[in-house]
Curated annotation (Swiss-Prot):
GO-annotated cellular components: membrane
Bilayer-spanning residue ranges: 30-50
Tissue/organ expression: Preferentially expressed around the apical meristem region.
Pfam family, one: zf-RING_2
Pathway: Protein modification; protein ubiquitination
Protein name in UniProt: RING-H2 finger protein ATL2
InterPro entries, sorted: ATL1/ATL16-like, Znf_RING, Znf_RING/FYVE/PHD
The reaction(s) this protein catalyses: S-ubiquitinyl-[E2 ubiquitin-conjugating enzyme]-L-cysteine + [acceptor protein]-L-lysine = [E2 ubiquitin-conjugating enzyme]-L-cysteine + N(6)-ubiquitinyl-[acceptor protein]-L-lysine
MF-aspect GO terms: ubiquitin protein ligase activity; zinc ion binding
UniProt-annotated location(s): Membrane
Keyword match Zinc: yes
UniProt domain comment: The RING-type zinc finger domain mediates binding to an E2 ubiquitin-conjugating enzyme.
Gene name of the record: ATL2
Length: 304
């Protein structure tokens, strides 16, 4: 018989089972490896998360520690002007009782006030024959009891916060704008030179024909001089106008007095010996007056 005529190998179920078990074993190993790798990845993520939290907390603690160290090392000093501090303390205490009493008071009635008026402190309307105060700056009205209680701890209007004391004290400020200065004038002998002619005013040798006489008053005579209060801006304006051409024709009495004082000091330096024929002057005499024609012309030009 030929080999081709032999019977084929019969199929055995055991061979199929062996191949299937081998496939299952391979897939099980792959699954186990994937689970292990995934487990390690999860562990790594958890570790990174914990490390990040630890690092951030450590950096925050360092920052807080550095800030606290800087606060301890830094010393801050505050200085204040005593006058400014006193002003702020007085302002926080409220208005003066005299200023509160000086505020105008009115009595509410339907005849005088047709429109209803509401008090901003107690939020109630005025009733018949109730008294109220009007603030001079903002013209706001309030009950007397309400606004007086408010002004014990405040110095501004409850509605617009405008100052009240600045306008309430206008009368006292205006009354104090002028001061009365009393100067005691020592009436020592004063030398008066009466020229006989216009040419007698020139510088001549002592003992000339001009008549000299001394006028004496006994005791002291008080002189009351009213000096108006002038602000710094007024003095500044006067200084700026002094060099202008218009200032040559108009000058204040103070500038005239200064010019006359300069003229007296110049004449006092020029006078070296007493006038002949005149009695000796007392030691308290301020100066000897010796006027010339040029001085009179100069004084006239300065007083214009």
């Amino acid at each position: 018989m030929n080999s081709n005529d032999q019977d084929p190998i019969p199929f055995r179920p055991e061979d199929n089972n062996f191949s299937g078990s081998k496939t299952y074993a391979m897939s099980g190993k792959i699954m186990l490896s994937a689970i292990v790798i995934l487990f390690f990845v999860v562990i790594l993520m958890v570790f990174l998360h914990l490390y990040a939290r630890w690092y951030l907390l450590r950096a925050r603690r360092r920052h807080l520690r550095r800030r606290s160290r800087n606060r301890r090392a830094t010393m801050v000093f505050f200085t204040a002007d005593p006058s400014t501090a006193a002003t702020s303390v007085v302002a926080s205490r409220g208005l003066d009782p005299n200023v509160i009493k000086s505020l105008p008071v009115f009595t509410f009635s339907d005849e005088t006030h047709k429109d209803p008026i509401e008090c901003a402190v107690c939020l109630s309307e005025f009733e018949e024959s109730e008294t109220g105060r009007v603030l001079p700056n903002c013209q706001h009205t309030f009950h007397v009891d309400c606004i007086d209680m408010w002004f014990h701890s405040h110095s501004t209007c409850p509605l617009c916060r405008s100052l009240v004391e600045s306008l309430a004290g206008i009368e006292s400020t205006a009354a104090a704008r002028e001061r009365e200065v009393v100067i005691a004038v020592d009436s020592d002998p004063v030398l008066v030179i009466e020229p006989s002619s216009s040419s007698g005013l020139t510088d001549e040798p002592h003992g000339s024909g001009s008549s000299q006489m001394l006028r004496e008053d006994s005791g002291r005579k008080p002189a009351a001089i009213e000096v108006p209060r002038r602000t710094f801006s007024e003095f500044e304006d006067e200084l700026t106008r002094r060099d202008s051409p218009a200032s040559q024709s108009f000058r204040s009495p103070m500038s005239r007095m200064l010019s006359f004082t300069r003229m007296l000091s110049r004449d006092r330096r020029s006078a070296s010996s007493p006038i002949a024929g005149a009695p000796p002057l007392s030691p308290t005499l301020s100066c000897r007056i010796q006027m010339t024609e040029s001085d009179i012309e100069r004084g006239g030009e300065e007083s214009r």
